[in-house]
């Protein structure tokens, strides 16, 4: 194994020292099950709670179809990325942009992948800031309904304070316990969401018709729902970084972990989406827990579990950003790797995502907008494009056809989903007061 890792290694001692300091490449001791809970934490999160809302905007036929097709497409594209991680002997593509550079060239690959990956990871951290704050607020209101109202801003600040500490853990393997807890919480609160909805039961007058007041509303709601579903399958942006933590050869253990992760994802997503929509119909909230008021202790517990999960999710998505920033500072700016460099960089990043989350907490609209604009390319069709370039399947073969079909579907998703999300943000902004 050591020989495999060292094969064709032409790095200088200084380059090795830097790589041993950077968060993505500093530790390669992970087991296959690490990839399971890292991927579950990356994928299952805020998105699962919005799936019944997405169903209400699409109806049974389109909703069920989109959820299942998205599960299949994203499992396929994730498999492609796992396959390509070590396709060049003696080299590992430890970061998404490194794979892009191999396919498109040094400069073009960087320009294509990095902006999209940064948008995905930073926007996800912002959304998790909002989700964590809202979950704490809902917990507070459930346990103390007669207490004085506290602004959402303060709950987001509490969530951020956790990350001012956790963000200084050095690498992926150092946050494994946090990620494992988050993965367990995701399955737990998903189960609570659909079982509590089932226990609540239907009032017998559930409407499964379009939730909009007119055709225009229904069209925009449909577009936003596409973004909700895209956001629910978002782990691709960190999959190579997760695989980088596994010793070489990493393909088999990584894929084993991914398969288990996707089974857990299905157990989380499908019951929440289908049962939540069945119980509430088109009256469902954009976060299903907001519509469940009793028993209050159970809803409070579910919201605490959401809080724990998005704490782990934030760290999973922040780590590649930390790696990018620290790589740039030590390799391009030539700053010396140090505790204070890492401390300053990560503290500023957490503060920035906290500020944006406090200022623009439009949860439903944010999911739709970022889901279509940024997550669709990096999750649905960029792996297919890279696969066609590097693997060169025969024209009109099954592999060639299926990749082009997924590319077209991904482009449609990228085009349509942000329209609905942006409209929801605008509508929310009309009545929103800053830092309320």
PLM regions: where:
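C-terminal ends of transmembrane helices
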Residues: 165-172, 329-330, 390
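Short, hydrophobic transmembrane alpha-helix segments
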Residues: 51-59, 172-173, 365
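Membrane-interfacial loop- and helix-cap regions that link adjacent transmembrane helices
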Residues: 3-8, 27-29, 33, 79, ...
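Membrane-interface "cap" regions at the ends of multi-pass membrane proteins
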Residues: 1-50, 74-79, 93
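Extracellular loop-to-transmembrane helix junctions
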Residues: 54-90
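Helix-loop interface residues and adjacent transmembrane-helix termini in multi-pass membrane transporters
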Residues: 48, 57-58, 168-169, 247-248, ...
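Central hydrophobic cores of alpha-helical transmembrane segments in multi-pass inner-membrane proteins
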Residues: 46, 71-80, 159-168, 383
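Residue-level recognition of membrane-helix boundary sites in multi-pass small-molecule transporters
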Residues: 62-63, 174, 253-256
């Amino acid at each position: 194994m050591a020989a495999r890792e060292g094969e064709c290694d032409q790095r200088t001692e200084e380059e090795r020292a830097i790589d041993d300091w950077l968060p993505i490449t500093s530790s390669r001791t992970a087991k296959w099950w690490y990839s399971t809970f890292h991927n579950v934490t990356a994928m299952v999160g805020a998105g699962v709670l919005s799936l019944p809302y997405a169903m209400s905007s699409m109806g049974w036929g389109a909703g069920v179809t989109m959820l299942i097709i998205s599960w299949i497409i994203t499992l396929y594209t994730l498999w492609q990325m796992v396959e390509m991680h070590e396709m060049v002997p003696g080299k590992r593509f430890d970061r998404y942009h490194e794979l892009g550079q191999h396919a498109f060239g040094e400069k073009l690959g960087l320009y294509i992948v990095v902006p999209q990956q940064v948008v995905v990871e930073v926007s996800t951290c912002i959304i998790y800031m909002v989700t964590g704050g809202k979950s704490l607020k809902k917990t507070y209101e459930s346990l103390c309904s007669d207490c004085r109202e506290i602004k959402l801003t303060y709950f987001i600040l509490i969530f951020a304070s956790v990350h001012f500490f956790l963000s200084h853990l050095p690498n992926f393997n150092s946050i494994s316990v946090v990620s494992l807890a988050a993965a367990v919480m995701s399955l737990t609160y998903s189960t609570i969401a659909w079982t509590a909805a089932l226990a609540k039961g239907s009032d017998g007058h559930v409407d499964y018709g379009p939730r909009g007041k007119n055709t225009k509303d229904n069209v925009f709601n449909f577009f936003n729902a596409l973004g909700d579903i895209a956001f629910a399958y978002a782990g691709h942006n960190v999959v190579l970084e997760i695989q980088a933590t596994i010793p070489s050869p990493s393909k088999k253990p990584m894929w084993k972990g991914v398969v288990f992760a996707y089974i857990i994802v299905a157990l989380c997503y499908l019951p929440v989406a289908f049962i939540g929509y069945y119980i509430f119909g088109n009256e469902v909230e954009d976060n299903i827990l907001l519509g469940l008021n009793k028993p209050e202790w159970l809803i409070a517990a579910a919201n605490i579990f959401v809080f724990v999960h998005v704490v782990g999710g934030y760290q999973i998505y922040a780590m590649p950003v930390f790696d990018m920033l620290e790589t740039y500072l030590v390799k391009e700016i030539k700053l010396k790797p140090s505790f204070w460099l890492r401390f300053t960089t990560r503290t500023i990043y957490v503060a920035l995502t906290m500020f944006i989350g406090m200022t623009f907490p439009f949860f439903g609209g944010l999911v739709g907008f970022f889901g279509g604009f940024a997550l669709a390319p990096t999750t649905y069709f960029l792996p297919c494009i890279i696969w066609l370039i590097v693997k060169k399947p025969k024209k009109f073969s099954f592999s060639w056809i299926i990749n082009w079909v997924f590319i077209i579907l991904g482009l449609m998703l990228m085009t349509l989903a942000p329209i609905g999300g942006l409209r929801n943000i605008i509508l929310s902004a009309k009545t929103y007061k800053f830092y309320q």
